[in-house]
Amino acid sequence: PRRGKYHQLTFSMDYFYRELYLLPFSHDETVHGKKTILDKLYGTYEEKFAQCRALYTYMFTHPGKKLNFMGNELGHFREWDESRELDWELLRYPAHDSFFRFFRELANLYLTSPALCEKEYNSACFRWLPTDSAEQETGGVYAYRRTAGGQTLVTVLNFSAEPLEGMKLGCADRTVLHEILNSDDVRWGGSGVTNPAPLVSFPIPCHGSPSTVRLHLAPLSAAVFALSGSPAAEQGKAWTVSGGRYMTV
């Protein structure tokens, strides 16, 4: 079970800065009876896709370069076979088409966000963030911050089967978080539990941080937030995405 294995996902950062790493989901893991990435995951048809979206969010927001074998983006159930082409016909089905579009959106976010693709080996640019969730160590709730190129992104992962309603996250004073990607968005085949309004911090200490923000996460989901520093500066301004750079307009 996933409970009790919390530190297996955090362990990678204990030795990350000693060498140069590639994060692979290669063909070796999807052949010879090992099942595809999607089919390895436990649960119903919908839960498999939800977990897969959360898994790839973790992969693309984790420091290090990525390697995904061809076909992973289709969410296929048949193992790779060198004697035939990929299962392109899967894109006719809504669940697979939604997953493909989510994968494309996630890859674009990675490629266009300095916080995700620059300074991976500068330890000052990555930090685990504590939460108040009782599920953190027993149910798989993770949060971390990536910073580079004048941009800060915060990723929150809920690998548990329980919803997180009003989860507290410690932060600096006068912090605003803007959700820029949520794996549970209905566009990607999710149930629609998102955080559409800016999350403004309030001055209640949380795990050593001077302020707190509250957010919601569906079971088996992940969200990425762009961080800004002044609620007053954000009043009356809408946020948009321009080539992956997040700016007020």
Feature names for model-found ranges:
Residues 86-102, 106-108, 168-199:
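C-terminal accessory region downstream of the catalytic core in glycan-modifying enzymes
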Residues 1-81, 111, 121, 126-169, ...:
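Conserved alpha/beta catalytic core and glycan-binding cleft of carbohydrate-active enzymes
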Residues 38-49, 87-97, 209-214:
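Active-site rim elements
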Residues 85, 132-133, 203:
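Alpha-helix boundary/capping detector
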Residues 49, 55, 94-102, 243-248:
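Repeat-unit-sized solenoid/scaffold elements
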